[in-house]
Amino acid sequence: MIPIFNITFYRPVYHYLVLPGLIGIVTSCNTASTADKNGVDNLSVLTLPKPTTVSPEETARIRNACVLWYDTVLKQKGFNGEILVAKNGNIIFEQYNGTGHLPGTDTISATTSLHIASVSKTFTAMAILKLWQNGKLNIDDEFSKYFPAFNYSGVTIRSLLNHRSGLPNYTHFLENLGWDKTRLVTNEDVLNFLITRKAELIDIAAPNSHFTYCNTNYALLALLIEKITGKKYADFINQTFFIPLQMKNSYVFSLADSAKALPSYNWKGKIEPFGFLDAVYGDKNIYTTVRDLLIWDRALSCNLLFTNETLEQAYAPYSNEKPGTRNYGLGWRMNIYPNGKKIIYHNGWWHGSNASFKRLLNDSATIIVIGNKFTRAIYHTKILASIIDSAYGPVDEEETETQKDLAAIKDPVSKTASVTNKNTVKATEVIAAKSLRQHKKKN
């Protein structure tokens, strides 16, 4: 445990507007890599393929729809952050709004790192799958193989990845069972609490009986990465992903980063204080930018880091008890449509930070929004997917990690979303449909 007192967080850090050229200028996706004895890739800097051309008509169609959605939904609902929409690796639409501190003069720019909350799980999951790909673990191993004191039979690495472990959520049980909130919780504390206080825990389900989204799973997976590699989670993520991919504005938060990490704010603009759960990582605590997340998307899409077999494991649906389009893979949410199309995505929410990272694999398109002043509008990005291709179907509000907790926030978007969103959807779809008809006539 770490005392929460006498820690200074969120000193002002000023970011200046730097807008380099489009990402990806080199031509190969086939850079080979080898792994050391701990499963860590010995990777030099990797190169992304050159983005393929998008027609001027298609670019204009998508951009016009994005501008309308941004102006009438995001910007009007207190958005403070970053948005990027890309097609074939080309940035079609990109906007930065607001300041890192409220009030402040540190304008948010392409180099401003924001907390992506549970979108961090995509990195944790792919780190585990990297170790599996390199032969350092079996994802069907029980977690207790690596932590013998862990007394939950049947909980496998796979069930942690796909949220079918049956474990309770540390974000609830620690406080409910009397954790001293003047002490920061660590990942080790989460594990030890599960082991030593098992008899007092409620809501423990049989492993693999059903899907329950649970941050505990990813706090434990971060410990597993450290156990197998002998490296701190942050170092492994940095060396395996951030450095090779030149994600220069990405980092895993630790207390040493307290001076540079931007704070988050509630929908009224009031700062969210640093809390006793805020030092746990694996489930959250990656800070990055929309441009760095585009690099991450492109590296995954062109098999720069992973084999097809590994990606098939990640993107497979594992919770099929109930019919419907929504499902969860290994670290990824997904919408699967009857026409065969699939949206691979993850949302995030922690305090005032929220994010949406949406990957339309069939259309080589990416939609990324990050903010540090809470607005539910960030979760309405599915409309942009339907603009790129109407086959993605009707628009509804996205899932986030703790829907019950999210419902308790009385932000203006929740009160007016139904009317505003319906009007915006209609207007945006009209513009997009008109542009699409014009494009088809020309071709």
Feature map (PLM): residue ranges:
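Bacterial N-terminal signal peptides that target proteins for export
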Residues: 2-17
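Bacterial N-terminal signal peptides
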Residues: 16-25
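Active-site-proximal loop and beta-strand segments within enzyme catalytic domains
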Residues: 46-49, 99-213
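Short, solvent-exposed loop/helix junctions and linker helices
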Residues: 56, 60-64, 113-118, 154, ...
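Hydrophobic (often cysteine-bearing) scaffold residues that line and stabilize catalytic clefts
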Residues: 62, 66, 116, 120, ...
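Short, surface-exposed loop or secondary-structure junction motifs
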Residues: 155-351
